[in-house]
Every structure is written in structure tokens, then in C-alpha cells.
Amino acid sequence: MMQPNAKLLSPSAKFLPSPIEPPQHNRRTTVGAPPSLERNCKLSRRNLSKSSLLLLLTTQTTLTPLLDFSKAQADTIANPNLTNCENRIPTKKAFIDVSIDGEPIGRIIIGLYGDDVPAGTARFSSIVSGKAGITYRRKDFVKIMPGYVQHGGIRSYGVDAERATAAVGSLQNLIEEWERGKRGEICNVNKAGSVGIVVRDPSKPPPKTKLVARNGKLVVEEEVIAVGPNGTEFVITAVDSPELEDSVLVIGKVLEGMGVVEKMREVKTVRDNTSSPYFRVAKVIGDKRAVVAERGFNRPYSKVVVTNCGLIESQTL
């Protein structure tokens, strides 16, 4: 058999170009590259931290006024009557003269919101004028708090209490006006200089129930724990006191005499011991001594008394 000729198999081999060798890449490694990269990364992180902090501070500075404005706007939307608090016009004027340990300290003139809270204004007016047969005259301020002073009202359980209930209307009318304030239908904000009637005690626990046998049947009765406000106590605020909004119906504001309120706040009082663990335990277990002691907290050592009070007959309010 004939062997194939190599020249015939590749006749153009000599005309083919020689293969091109692939380029030789420089594979030398730089020893100093990783440290330099690490150093650059550290520098970037440091700069990033500074930039982030600056951005955070700038954002807070920019957004804080916006958040405050949004919160105020939300409060206004939730309770649109808050914007009308400053627009209320007093319809009556009343005055109370105050003394400390027999020394007169001045007169407080109060403007009453008869159009907004007619029941509360009518009750306060009847007592301050003596029209109901009872009066705040010669009655004491029983509590002096950092933000407000509180008058004890008519606390007698004799003829005065019966007259107070019969002559000035029921407490329920005041509670209904207070509930309107909670719903935002009327303004009931305890700003500095506000005057309000205490209508409820938010710290008073709900009445306990017990089973008693009556006429051969078991009947559920409520046990009265303590006597609540009777709608004759009132407070005068020296600073904004939102904590009072759960118990006080705002009926007016101080027009003159805030200096008298400040003098009353300077009177020394019985130290509030509600933070004591012993008092807390006694209160939890229902020790009556704790209840009695609590009534004495923040009471003035001096005798702070309303020496005279009444309505001011004036057409200009």
C-alpha cells in the first residue's frame, strides 16, 4: 500500500504564519498593596463616620421644628377646640381676699366663663357670693402643690353640706361639662392662671362589690370606699398643670392677683411621702392609717384662709 506523502498532506504548511505567542502578563505582586488598601479603607470608614454624624445632626436640626409643628397640628386636628381656649371671654368677675396666719396678702380677681361652662360658673358664683347660703369665706386652702393651690371647699357634714347640694345644683351637671371637655367639645385645658372646680378623684379606686342576704335573697351591693369631691373645692394653677385635666373642670382664669398665688406657694407644707416603700405597702394592703396620712400630704403648716369673697358688678370685663 502506498504511504501518503507528508508534503501532499500539508502543501501550504510553509505558507502558514507562525503561531503568535500569547502576551506575557506581568505577574509580579506588589507587597505594599494590601496595607495601602487597608489604610484607605480605614480612612474611608473614618470619613464615612464623620459624614454620617454630620448628616444626623443636620437631619435632627431640620426635622425637629417640623416634628414639633406636626405634633401641634395633630393635636389641633384631634381637638380643634384647643385653638379656642385663648379666645374665651369671661362673662363674670369674682374676687377672693386671702390671708396667711391672719395677715392679708392681697386679692385675686377671677374671670368666669359663663358661656362655655354655665353649670360650673353658676355653682362657683352661688358659693362665692353667698347666695346659696354657703360661702368660701373663712374656709381654708388645704393643699399647696408645686403647680397649683387647692381650696377645701365646703366640707362640713352638717347644714352647709345639705345647702350646698340643694342650692347650687347637682355634681352630675359639673361632671357632664367635664366629660364634654374630655371629648373636645369645650376647652378644658389647665393653663397657668386657670381656675377650676374639682369634680372627681381619679385616684379613687372603683367601689368594691359584696354579696349580702336581703329578704332571703343574695344581693350584690357596692361598698363606698371614701367620700369623693362634692363640687365645692376649687384650684388655682400657677403653671401649666395637665395632670389636673382628669379631675378639674376649668371655669375661669385669674385676671389679677397672681402675685398672691405665688405668696401662697411659698408657704411650707407637710412633706409628700408617697414614694416611701412603707407607705406603698400600707396603701396596697388597705391600711387606713395610710389613707389618713395621705390626706395630710402637702397641707400648709400656716393657716391660709379666704377672708372675703364675692362677685364684682361691672359691665366691663
Swiss-Prot record:
The segments labelled Disordered in the record are 1-37
PROSITE patterns, A to Z: CSA_PPIASE_2
Pfam families from the entry?
Pro_isomerase
Identify the EC number(s).
Answer: 5.2.1.8
Assigned keywords, A-Z: Chaperone, Chloroplast, Isomerase, Plastid, Rotamase, Thylakoid, Transit peptide
Protein's UniProt keywords contain ATP-binding:
no
**Listed GO molecular functions?**
peptidyl-prolyl cis-trans isomerase activity
What GO terms fall under cellular component here? chloroplast; chloroplast thylakoid; mitochondrion
What region holds the PPIase cyclophilin-type domain? 95-311
Q: Which InterPro entries match?
A: Cyclophilin-like_dom_sf, Cyclophilin-type_PPIase_dom, CYP26-2-like
Q: In which tissues is it expressed?
A: Ubiquitous. Lower levels of expression in roots.
Q: Where are the transmembrane segments?
A: none
Keyword Plastid among record annotations: yes
Say which enzyme class the record assigns: isomerase
Q: Could you tell me what induces this protein?
A: Down-regulated by sucrose treatment.
Where is this gene product found?
Plastid, Chloroplast thylakoid
- Reading the lineage from the top rank, the first entry is Eukaryota
Which residues, if any, are the signal sequence? none
Reaction catalyzed: [protein]-peptidylproline (omega=180) = [protein]-peptidylproline (omega=0)
Summary of the function given for this chain in its UniProt record? PPIases accelerate the folding of proteins. It catalyzes the cis-trans isomerization of proline imidic peptide bonds in oligopeptides.
Question: What family does this chain come from, according to its entry?
Answer: Belongs to the cyclophilin-type PPIase family.
Protein name (database record): Peptidyl-prolyl cis-trans isomerase CYP26-2, chloroplastic
